[in-house]
């Protein structure tokens, strides 16, 4: 049986998420997989590539062939170089640490409203007009 390591697409339209799977080469892209060995989320910045290196090494060792996109991912993570016995690539880009944001109270924010809402003023005006009309009709 010819085995391939390929991407299985998940997610909505224009929001792809992939699982790196080991499957028979004759199965459909999103068909049944033998084993899931990783994840790939290209829309995140930087993109997320999680690969189970031990299982990748096993499947490459028993003859599984990676597809071109999976081969590119394996080269970025360094698993392909480890399998071939070559030096590892430079480390991947890691997301930057976000600076601590000051709390709302520390900035001087107040928890008070700006005053009455516009709709309440309109209702008050209508009540005043109704009271003026009723007093005018009585007089």
From Swiss-Prot:
NCBIfam families listed in its UniProt record: PRK14520.1, S16
Signal peptide positions on this chain: none
Gene: rpsP
Gene3D superfamilies: 3.30.1320.10
Keyword Ribonucleoprotein attached: yes
GO molecular function, one term: structural constituent of ribosome
Protein name: Small ribosomal subunit protein bS16
Top-level taxonomic group: Bacteria
Organism expressing this protein natively: Streptomyces lividans
One annotated Gene Ontology cellular component of this protein: cytoplasm
Keyword check for Ribosomal protein: yes
Family: Belongs to the bacterial ribosomal protein bS16 family.
Keywords: Ribonucleoprotein, Ribosomal protein
Region (Disordered) location: 84-139
GO annotation terms (biological process): translation
InterPro entries, sorted: Ribosomal_bS16, Ribosomal_bS16_CS, Ribosomal_bS16_dom_sf
């Amino acid at each position: 049986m010819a085995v391939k390591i390929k991407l299985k697409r998940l997610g909505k339209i224009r929001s792809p998420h992939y699982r790196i799977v080991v499957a028979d080469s004759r199965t459909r892209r999103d068909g049944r997989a033998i084993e899931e060995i990783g994840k790939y989320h290209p829309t995140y910045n930087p993109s997320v590539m999680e690969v189970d290196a031990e299982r990748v090494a096993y499947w490459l060792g028993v003859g599984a062939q990676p597809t071109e996109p999976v081969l590119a991912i394996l080269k970025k993570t360094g698993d392909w170089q480890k399998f071939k016995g070559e030096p590892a690539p430079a480390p991947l880009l890691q997301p930057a640490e976000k600076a601590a944001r000051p709390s709302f109270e520390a900035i001087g924010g107040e928890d008070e409203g700006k005053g009455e809402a516009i709709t309440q003023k309109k209702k008050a005006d209508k009540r005043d007009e109704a009271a003026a009309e009723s007093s005018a009709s009585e007089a």
